[in-house]
Design a protein with these regions (language model features):
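Conserved N-terminal phosphate-binding loop of PLP-dependent enzymes in the Aspartate aminotransferase
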Residues: 1-131
Length: 131
C-alpha cells in the first residue's frame, strides 16, 4: 500500500497531537465559531448584492461559496480577480470558491480580505455587463 513519506514519523505525530490539544480548547473553538459568522454574514451579503453565490456552505473556517446559475463555471475567474485585488482564495471545481483562512485571523484581516473579494466580484460583474 502507499503511504506518505512522513506519515509515520514520530515527530510529526507529536506535533499533530499538540496542535489538536490547542485547537480543541473551548476558547479556540468559540473563536472559530465567531470568525465563521464574520465570513458567512459577509459572504451572504456579497452573494445577495451581486447574485454571485447561491449557497455558502462549510463548517468552521473551511467555507465553500457555490456559484449561482448566472455565475456558473466562473469560480476560477473570481479566484484570479481576487488574487489581483490581494485576497488569496481557492476553488473546488469550476462552481465553488473555497476559503480556508487561519483559525486566528483578525476581524480587520477578515474585512480586508472580503473587501478585496468584493472588489473582484464587482470588476467581473462590470466586465460582464459591458460585454
Amino acid at each position: 500500500t502507499h503511504g506518505t513519506t512522513y506519515g509515520g514519523n514520530l515527530l510529526a505525530s507529536v506535533v499533530a497531537e499538540a496542535v489538536l490539544d490547542v485547537v480543541n480548547q473551548p476558547e479556540v473553538l468559540a473563536g472559530v465559531q465567531e470568525r465563521h459568522q464574520w465570513f458567512r454574514n459577509r459572504l451572504e451579503k456579497i452573494g445577495q448584492q451581486y447574485g454571485v453565490f447561491k449557497e455558502i456552505r462549510g463548517l468552521g473556517l473551511l467555507l465553500g461559496c457555490v456559484m449561482s446559475e448566472s455565475w456558473a463555471g466562473r469560480a476560477g475567474e473570481i479566484m484570479k480577480a481576487a488574487h489581483d485585488e490581494g485576497a488569496m482564495v481557492l476553488i473546488a471545481g469550476p462552481d465553488v470558491l473555497r476559503l480556508a483562512p487561519s483559525l486566528v485571523i483578525t476581524e480587520e484581516e477578515t474585512r480586508m480580505g472580503l473587501d478585496a473579494l468584493e472588489r473582484a466580484v464587482v470588476k467581473l460583474a462590470t466586465q460582464s455587463k459591458a460585454a
